[in-house]
Amino acid sequence: MNRQGVRLLPDRGGSLAAFGVGLAVVIILLGMGRPPICPCGVVRLWHGVVESAENSQQVSDWYSFSHLIHGFLFYGAAHIVWRRFGFAELSPRWALALAVLIEGSWEILENSPIIIDRYRSVTISWGYSGDSVLNSAADIGFMAAGFLFAARAPVLVTVVLGIGFELFTLWAIRDNLALNILMLVWPVEAVRVWQGGG
């Protein structure tokens, strides 16, 4: 099959592999002692208060938009790898499973003491204690949804939507994927003060 004919959507095997990887991540997170659900004992589909004990504990929150963007970006990377460079060693049906592996690896790292402490020390997430397993699983699901959306939507639509999500969350909570990465890797005190309402 030529590069233009490569399909990046998973077949049944690819979908099962993606699900299996996600399930393995859930098992690892439980083994790490992460709480299965919010310690408050309540499960909500949405929690919109960033500075609260339930942030990153429920099914979705403001940072779910970032995970959708992860999916957009992972699909873009897969497109480059398979369509532009003809990555023949691995069938494109595994692209989603590979994206889930990357996202799941981040969820595991994000819930490790080193990253939790980093978030607490350099970002506005002063009380951050990691995600519930429910939230991590949902984050992986949002990434997969973003990946599958990008696989079907025109590139321009995906790009505009991603920028829209970034601007919307920047307006709503003074945070987004770009600022999250910036503050985690190279903290800027002025940004932290602004995010804190200063």
Swiss-Prot record:
Q: Is-annotated flag, keyword Membrane?
A: yes
Q: Which residues cross the membrane?
A: 13-33, 62-82, 96-116, 153-173, 177-197
Q: Which locations, inside or outside the cell, does it occupy? A: Cell membrane
Its membrane topology is listed as: Multi-pass membrane protein
State the source organism's domain of life: Bacteria
Disulfide connectivity for this sequence is none
Signal peptide range equals none
One GO cellular component term, please give it. Answer: plasma membrane
Asked whether the keyword Amino-acid biosynthesis is assigned, the reply is no
Its keywords, alphabetically, are:
Cell membrane, Membrane, Transmembrane, Transmembrane helix
| Family from the record | Belongs to the UPF0314 family.
The protein, known as: UPF0314 protein Saro_1818
